[in-house]
Amino acid sequence: MLKVRVIPCLDVKDGRVVKGVQFVDLRDAGDPVEAARAYDLAGADELTFLDITASHENRGTILDVVRRTAEQCFMPLTVGGGVRTVDDVRTLLHAGADKVSINTAAVNRRAFVGEAAEKFGEQCIVVAIDAKRVSKEGEENRWEIFTHGGRTPTGIDAIQFAREVVDLGAGEILLTSMDRDGTGQGFDCALTRAVADAVHVPVIASGGVGTLDHLVDGIREGGASAVLAASIFHFGTFTIREAKERLAEAGLPVRLDV
């Protein structure tokens, strides 16, 4: 089994971290580069930046953040948010991103995933899926993809969509349960498992982490290859080291060399 990756996620708006980072004594908790450097030193396996800047005009700010982060950090960097064209992907990769995450654009036009993967390689292309459970109690589990921060239903089945984008060339799936996101109640492991069983690429579990055992559940029960969390790390509830030690205690392989 490959080593399980622990991935903090930073939401960035107009070049600033939106959910404050309080876990270390940062001079400027709103500076994403400062936060990224702290996570790098703490032993994070990767970092995800999600650019939630509303307007496309302000894209220059995230490029500056990516450039400065890539200069100072060794961990791989995934950047998502507002990626709509092959040029967007190219620009982010040139700025220093290792992987680019595509969300709404993949829902609107599946072929974009294939075009990006063909141009830059499958290993660079992550498809982010935001899913909500739509099945009723007692029914077979069904999850639907929602866009625009979980507000807009698409009618698209999440499991089928995951299969389609992987067939087109997505090298990884970043899977967020909109039902669990921000609740601290743990991943929707049934959703994670359903997607992990349906595709042959790594699945990153996201949405709902409140305890270290939730991370273990995401791998053990959910079949994920990596776990992503925001609040538990940003607010100092747990450190990256503690997360990895808990995974190791559970018998899961992690990188503990920091």
From Swiss-Prot:
Gene3D superfamilies assigned: Aldolase class I
Active-site positions on this chain: 11, 130
Catalytic activity: 5-[(5-phospho-1-deoxy-D-ribulos-1-ylimino)methylamino]-1-(5-phospho-beta-D-ribosyl)imidazole-4-carboxamide + L-glutamine = D-erythro-1-(imidazol-4-yl)glycerol 3-phosphate + 5-amino-1-(5-phospho-beta-D-ribosyl)imidazole-4-carboxamide + L-glutamate + H(+)
EC identifiers of the protein: 4.3.2.10
UniProt key word 4Fe-4S: no
One CC-aspect GO term: cytoplasm
Transmembrane annotation, as ranges: none
Subcellular location: Cytoplasm
Protein name per Swiss-Prot or TrEMBL: Imidazole glycerol phosphate synthase subunit HisF
Organism of origin: Xanthobacter autotrophicus (strain ATCC BAA-1158 / Py2)
Species classification: Bacteria, Pseudomonadati, Pseudomonadota, Alphaproteobacteria, Hyphomicrobiales
